[in-house]
Amino acid sequence: MSKLPEAKLDVLLAHHASLEAQLLGEVGASEYVRITRELSELNPLVEAVKAYREVRDELGDVDALLEDPDTDSEMRAMAEAERDALDAHRAELIQEIRVALLPKDAMDERNVMLEIRAGTGGDEASLFAGDLFRMYEKFAALQGWSVEVISASEGSMGGFKEIIAEVKGRGAFAKLKFESGVHRVQRVPDTETQGRIHTSAATVAVLPEVEEVDVDIKADDLKIDTMRAQGAGGQHVNKTESAIRITHLPTGIVVMMQDSRSQHKNRASAMNILRSRIYDAEQQRLDAARSAERKEKVGSGDRSERIRTYNFPQGRVTDHRINLTLYKLPQVIAGEALGELIDALTTEHQAAQLAAQGHAA
């Protein structure tokens, strides 16, 4: 088992102690918030490092006892059993520390733009898109996050042809980023009289909320059109040109927003979505190149990839990237067991990162 970077851990512990000392002095409100937030992020790693070093010292004591020729057989047997337990605990702590030291995605703490679109399957696909949105909405509530619908186009029988929402909460992108891709549902629709199982699909895109400083958008690269907002039948629903369509000419990305009566609000919402999509398009390109080199199953950035199947007759959910099946479909759709899938995907991604660094997961 390769060693941990002890010098790096010493620096980490010293920095943690320095932050704690700063809190004992006089600090402003904003600085207090920054320090306490950094401490809360460092605390799990610091505790693991301290526990690892305690176990390492205990192992040294046990080894000394085993090497002592005067140790009797009964004491030796007890020491060997203790050594096995300490060795296993040390291995767990080393893995925990290595994972904690992995490079963090700069966007992990950001809010999320969640986009869900009905795919193949007509009305049933729209209903499924609605089910997915409610699943994420309930999951967000369990995390203490908030969800605000930015734009929605309802299906003729319910659900959504398309819905865009902002998920606000610390670590939202870290939790939801592996949800992007094609989600497939297999079930008997309410309108099906023969009892046949239909297969439908919806596409989910999870984009980090991007700030102006993250993406350089030149005014000359934008084509902005204004128009009167239209209802479902194509009729104009107000007399002012409040609807906005923004085209980013270099990438061809188009965002249209008409949900607000305020052109200013529609424009701001459209620009937020545009920034996220431009950033995401570049990240997809980089992720695809990276995953092709590493043959990663998770985080490939391929939005056309079928990632998960929800089979209602069998009550199961299967994530195809990691071959994980849970017979907890009602709990997953209710947002309660979705975390189990997300945690498994995160673990797989971390294992790939560790393998890339030359460590066994």
UniProtKB/Swiss-Prot annotation:
Name of the coding gene: prfA
Compartment(s): Cytoplasm
GO MF annotations in UniProt: translation release factor activity, codon specific
Protein name according to UniProt: Peptide chain release factor 1
Free-text function comment from the UniProt entry: Peptide chain release factor 1 directs the termination of translation in response to the peptide chain termination codons UAG and UAA.
Highest taxon of the lineage: Bacteria
Protein biosynthesis is among the record's keywords: yes
Family: Belongs to the prokaryotic/mitochondrial release factor family.
UniProt keyword Protein biosynthesis, yes or no: yes
Keywords attached to this entry: Cytoplasm, Methylation, Protein biosynthesis
Modified residues (N5-methylglutamine): 235
Post-translational events: Methylated by PrmC. Methylation increases the termination efficiency of RF1.
Gene Ontology cellular-component annotations: cytoplasm
